[in-house]
Amino acid sequence: AFAEAAVDQVEPIFRSGLGAQPARFKGQGDFATEVDLVIEQQLRDILTQMTGIPVYGEESGGSVLDTVWVVDPIDGTANYSAGNPLAGILVALIHKGAPVVAVSDFPLLGRRLVTCDGSPLRSVGGPATGFGGGEDAMGFDEARGHVGCSSHLPTEIFHELRETGLRPRMTGSVGLDNAFVAQGVFDGAINFSPHPWDNAAGALQIQTAGGVVTDPEGNPWTAQSRGLVAGTPQVHATIVDILSRHSGSFHR
C-alpha cells in the first residue's frame, strides 16, 4: 500500500514531463532528466516518511541493505525524453536480497502491476497474467516466442535466439519487458543489468504470475544478480541454454 501510494503521488509529474530533455549525463549515452531527479527525490521522501525504510535510487544512490526500497523514477529515460510512452516508474522493497513488494507503473500506457510476497498479481490494463487459467485465458503462447531484450544484447546471442524460433523485441525499457512477461504479452525477457532497481519489481511480479526467474547463469535472482532471464519454463530454459554457450560475451 505504501509503494502504490507513493507512485500515485508522483504519477502526475511523470505524465506532465514527457519529452523532458537530458539534465545529467552518466556516460555511454545514459542520462537523467530533471523529471527523473524530482520523482526520485519525492519517492525517497514519501517512502522514508511512511515506512522509515531507506531508499536506494538510480539517480541518487544508496546501498542494498538488509531491508531497502529500490526505485527507478523513470525506467526507459531515453524513450521518455524522446516523447515515447514506453517508460515507467519502478518501486520494490527488498528484504535479505529478495523483492517482497513490487509496483511497476506505466502511466502513459495505462498499465500497472502490483504484488507483494504471498499475494496474487494485480494487473491494471492489459491481461492479468498468461500463466494458468482456462483455455480462454489471455496467455503465454510459446509458439509465438516474443522475448524482450535490450540493445546491449550481443549480436551472436540475438541471432541464436532467432534461430531457435524465438522473436526478440526491444522496447527500450527493462521494466516494461519484465511487466510484459508477467502479463503474458511476452513469453520471456533477458537483460544484463546489474542494478536492482531495474529488475527487482519485475522479478517478483513474474514469479507471482507463475513464471521462472533467474540470473543469466540460471541461479535464483537476487538483488546482487548481474542480469535477469525470465519467462515460461520452455522459453526460459531455451534462453539459459543459449547463454551458457556465450557466457564470455555478456559478463561486464
Question: PLM features: residue spans?
Answer:
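Short amphipathic alpha-helical face segments that pack within enzyme cores
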Residues: 42, 88, 201-204
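N-terminal subdomain of lithium-sensitive/metallo-dependent phosphomonoesterases centered on the IMPase/IPPase/PAP
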Residues: 1-74, 252
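DPxDG-like acidic metal-binding loop motif
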Residues: 65-122
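Residue-level signal for inorganic ion chemistry
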Residues: 10, 14-17, 36, 47, ...
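Short helix-loop capping/hinge motifs at secondary-structure junctions, enriched
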Residues: 120-123, 128, 234-238
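An extended, acidic
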Residues: 135-252
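Conserved residues at the C-terminal ends of beta-strands
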Residues: 58, 105, 192
